Structures are given as structure tokens and as C-alpha cells.
Swiss-Prot record:
The name this protein goes by in its record: Aquaporin
NCBIfam families associated with the record: MIP
GO cellular component: apical plasma membrane; basolateral plasma membrane; membrane; plasma membrane
Homology family: Belongs to the MIP/aquaporin (TC 1.A.8) family.
Its biological purpose: Forms a water-specific channel.
Extracellular side: 47-51, 116-132, 185-205
Motif (NPA 1): 76-78
Signal recorded as keyword: no
Chief location bin: membrane
Tree of life domain: Eukaryota
GO MF, any single term: water channel activity
Keyword Transmembrane helix in annotation: yes
Membrane side Cytoplasmic: residue ranges: 1-26, 73-94, 154-163, 227-245
Amino acid sequence: MVEKTEMSKFVGVADITENKKIWRMLLGELVGTFFLIFVGVGSTTSGSVPQIAFTFGLTVATIAQGLGHLSGCHINPAVTLGFLIVGEISILKAAFYIIVQCVGAIAGAAVIKVALDGVAGGDLGVSSFDPSLNCAQAVLIEALITFILVFVVKAVSDPGRQDIKGSAPLAVGLAIAAGHLCAIKLSGASMNPARSFGPAVVQGVWTYHWVYWVGPIAGGLLAGIIYRLIFKVRKGDDETDSYDF
């Protein structure tokens, strides 16, 4: 009976059928991803690397501050799967999150396409990597920068930590900005399958699109597992050496 209950909890039927807040949570993920794509992709039209990096990072930080209380503000399938792999979100809830994230990304890309109609360079920031790299290298880079992102998300949302005195959304946003500054000229610095999916659908460009699912998802899953097994704060842990900003 206990095993059946645990399995039911992991699948998460009750999360969808009995949770009165589920539709608000899903709407939060959809709206958050919509604005991430609309604002972030808008910066790729003629922006410099720092401009694009900080636009994406600060957009995520702002959205997380505004919508985090609803759904946790994943707005990224790699983040959602990083929570799923360690049992911190149910299968069905994760599936619904990812679906609405992709829908929001498509909507955001469609609206910005209309807004940028006729604007030079309005390719919607379709994800692509440097021609000097091969697919394996692009996947590795995406996995590594997404690992950093999801690791930071897990760290700042760890309920056992008492040492975090700064802004959790800002920390996540800076992780995204750092990933862009490091890798945008290499892999394109997607770090988010939905971010790549929306523009790909609207533009109809699917060249090596799988790279931007495999890399970020691999990095997100690995970050979730490693943080849970090694770095998660456990009862009785000594935090006397924690930083104090």
C-alpha cells in the first residue's frame, strides 16, 4: 500500500485533478515563458553580446520575482526535469509544465515576429552553433552552461539553506547572463529547450534543433541529481561557515 501511494504521488494524478491552484500555476508558466521569449528574442535583433546576455538574465530574474510564488517560475523544461529527476515534482505536473512552456514560447515568438516584421536581422534568434563546432561539442557546451543554471536554481530554492540573504531570482538571472557571455558565440547559449523551440516553430528552422533539447536536458538532469546527492542541505548540517553578505 505504501509503495502504491508513493507511486501515485510520483505520477501526480492528484496534482492535476485535485489541486485547485494548478491552472494558475500553468498559466504562470505560460505567461512567464511568453515574456521571456518576447523580451529576450527581441534583444537579438541587433543587440551586442552583453545586451543579449543581460536582457535574458534580467528578464528571467524579473519574471521569477513576479510569478515565482505561483509555480516556482521554471519557464524552462530543463529546470522542470531537474526537479522531476529527484522527485520534487510529479511526472504529470512536469509534463503539463513543459507543454505550457512550449506553448508560451511559440506565442512569444509569434508575437515578436509580427512586431519585427520588416526589421533587418529579425530572425527571432533561432538557436544555432558556430560552424567550427560539431554537434557533440555544441551539446557538451549547452549541457555545461545549463548545469550551472539548474544547479543555481536548486541551490537558491533549497529549503534547508538559511544562509541566503540576497535575491534568489537575481542569482538565477546572473547565471543565465554568465552562460550567454560565455557561450553565445559558441553554442548559441540556449540553456532552455522552450527558448529554442518557439522561434524554431515560428521560423520553420529545425537545423540541429535536437542539440538544444539533448544538451540542456542532460545538464539539467545531472545538476538535479548531483545537487540532491551531494550538496543539498540536510538536517544537522553545520552551516556556521556559510557566507554572509
